């Protein structure tokens, strides 16, 4: 379902992308080429800042937003999802947030007020809150990463983890 606000802002979805009929896209959402948005996903850019301004939620080409994912932006802040990025079932991305290209987020992952670099893998049931995760980092399942985390303790993405995330992206893009 595509929803607009009283000002007339409406989501923009590229013709080559697929949005499941049960998904909800609200207001300032931009969906680029060959994006898959699965059942019951909610992508909402419908809050304004103190000046009445609202940044968009941008989803990069060839990305997939799976079943039940919520992407939302606090007080008009931007959310940018890079190209070839996979966000698995029931994950939450809450802006302000920037996600690089080729990133994988496992199911039930929570991201809030963070920047996640290119090629990162954040496994299932993990939280990244209030920090910047450099390119190529690997967050194991059930970990909580925040401003208190010593990033020197975070491993780099392995070839297996990278291949898995790329395979998920390819599989879901085949659906578009």
Kindly give the residue locations of the regions a language model identified:
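N-terminal segments that cap or nucleate solenoid repeat domains
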Residues: 1-40
């Amino acid at each position: 379902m595509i929803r607009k606000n009283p000002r007339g802002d409406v989501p923009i979805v590229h013709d080559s992308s697929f949005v499941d009929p049960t998904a909800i896209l609200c207001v300032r959402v931009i969906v680029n080429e060959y994006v898959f948005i699965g059942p019951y996903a909610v992508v909402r850019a419908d809050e304004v800042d103190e000046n009445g301004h609202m940044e968009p939620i941008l989803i990069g080409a060839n990305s997939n937003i799976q079943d039940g994912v919520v992407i939302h932006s606090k007080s008009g802040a931007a959310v940018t999802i890079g190209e070839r990025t996979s966000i698995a079932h029931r994950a939450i991305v809450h802006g302000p947030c920037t996600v690089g290209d080729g990133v994988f987020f496992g199911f039930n992952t929570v991201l809030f007020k963070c920047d996640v670099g290119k090629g990162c893998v954040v496994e299932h049931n993990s939280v990244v809150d209030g920090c910047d995760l450099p390119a190529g980092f690997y967050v194991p399942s059930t970990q909580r990463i925040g401003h208190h985390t010593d990033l020197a303790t975070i491993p780099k993405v392995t070839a297996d983890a990278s291949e898995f995330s790329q395979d998920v992206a390819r599989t879901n893009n085949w659906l578009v």
